């Protein structure tokens, strides 16, 4: 087999799987603690188009938990720092950035009609709810992180359907 940057991934999922990733458009809301690692994984998996949404800049307190945070990136716009990182890993990836605070009102104008998946990694509960409701109404597949900040017992981490009761107030 001819070697290329995604050769190992191709061994796992085959050429068809690789093509599916390459032709996918994924939108990530929030590129902080959860979102930056999500973007990194999607980039390294070979997703063809990534749309990043975050209004924040990198700060000193991000150094311990956000993949794009270094002393060189402090005070820089997170989505732009992440875009530069993505393109240093996968030059063929199309990266679209929006430096904007997510609200119920701007969600419809941000999400393109042809998006395949949405990842919710935002902290603001009202925006999180609005995003899930919008995607649900439009039939857009969404993965939502309810956050694990200040949690010390990894055995308590749960993955579940948001519509099933799992005991987190932010999921009700």
Predicted segments with their positions:
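Hydrophobic/small residue at the entry helix of a nucleotide-binding pocket
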Residues: 34-35
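Conserved small/polar residues in nucleotide/adenosyl-binding loops
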Residues: 169-171
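A structured beta-alpha segment of the ubiquitous adenosine-cofactor-binding alpha/beta core
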Residues: 75-116, 122-125
């Amino acid at each position: 087999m001819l070697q290329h940057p995604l050769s190992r991934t191709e061994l796992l999922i085959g050429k068809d799987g690789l093509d599916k990733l390459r032709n996918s458009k994924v939108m990530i809301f929030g590129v902080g603690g959860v979102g930056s690692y999500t973007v990194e994984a999607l980039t390294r998996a070979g997703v063809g188009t990534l749309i990043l949404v975050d209004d924040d800049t990198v700060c000193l307190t991000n150094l311990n938990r956000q993949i794009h945070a270094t002393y060189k990136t402090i005070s820089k716009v997170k989505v732009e720092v992440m875009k530069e990182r993505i393109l240093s890993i996968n030059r063929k990836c199309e990266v679209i950035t929006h430096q904007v605070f997510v609200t119920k009102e701007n969600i419809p104008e941000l999400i393109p009609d042809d998006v395949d998946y949405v990842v919710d990694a935002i902290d603001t509960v009202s925006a999180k709810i609005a995003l899930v409701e919008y995607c649900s109404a439009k039939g857009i597949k969404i993965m939502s992180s309810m956050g694990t900040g200040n949690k010390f017992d990894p055995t308590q981490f749960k993955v579940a359907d948001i519509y099933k009761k799992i005991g987190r107030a932010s999921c009700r």
